Amino acid sequence: MAKQLLGKEVTDALNAKLIERANALKEKGVVPTLGIVRVGENPSDLSYEKGATKRAELIGINVQKFVLPEDASKEDLLKLIDEINANDAIHGVLMVRPLPKHLKADQNEICNRLDPKKDVDCMTDLSNAGVFEGRSDLGFAPCTPAACMEILDYYGIDCKGKNAVVIGRSLVVGKPAAMMLMGKNATVTVCHTKTVNTAEVCRKADILVSAAGVLNSLTKDYVRPGQVVIDVSINWDENKPNARGGLGAIAGDAVYAEVEPSVKAITPVPGGVGSVTTSVLMKHVIEAAERV
């Protein structure tokens, strides 16, 4: 049976350290503050905002919310971002995405309007460049791949000299995860939809990060004994039993019943990477406040 790499243990340890750092900042007269920018009243956006606010309050981070109507123009949003950039009391900014359909074509321009020093969720090109150059002074890494690194660190999984395979090449998870693993001196291979013999490639990995976003795509054919599997994806499985006694629940990429007995360690879904991601966001806010 594989060791479960539980996100709660990582989150609890990380939160405890962040609370200490938040208190130290307050003793110096600095109140770490997160600005949350939301356009519209999408229920999933509201849920995400609620979760982020709750975690911030637990750690001792102040939250300021900036809400624009669903039909807000690009100019309205850019003006708001400029105002937040000029507000020295706000150290980090979370812009709830995706933006409404009429703003999607301008999303890159809108994201890059944000001051990279306040970009705690890696929305700007400069922050992304920092990930690829290994320069944290340029910005913060995306929270999800950073959460993967927190899990590896917490459980003492050394990446140096290890073969790591990342499934997925998105700019949000796959590519930055690959760069961050290289930063830990792993030898990294990235698999994607055009990769030939993906299962064979994955079986050679010591550390396998699955960020395909495809339910049941990671089967026992992709893994071998001794591997560490980080299942990043959050998918909906309509056939998975839920806590209410019915069907329909969150699941990762892995066919868990197949993969778990075959590997050394694995992150469950839910209860793995996702639970760490929000605390990583708060870590970035604290770090941004410490840099002021």
Language-model regions: role of each:
Residues 1-30:
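Positively charged, low-complexity intrinsically disordered leader regions
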Residues 76-88:
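Short, well-structured alpha-helical segments in soluble
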Residues 39-53, 136-232, 237-240, 247-260:
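Glycine-rich phosphate/diphosphate-binding loop of Rossmann-like nucleotide-binding domains
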Residues 108-119, 124-132, 233-292:
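Rossmann-fold NAD(P)-binding glycine/threonine-rich loop
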Residues 56-70, 188-190:
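Short beta-strand elements in bilobed, periplasmic/extracellular small-molecule ligand-binding domains
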Residues 31-40:
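Short beta-strand segments enriched in small/hydrophobic residues
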Residues 92-159, 216:
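Anion-binding alpha/beta catalytic cores of soluble intermediary-metabolism enzymes, centered on
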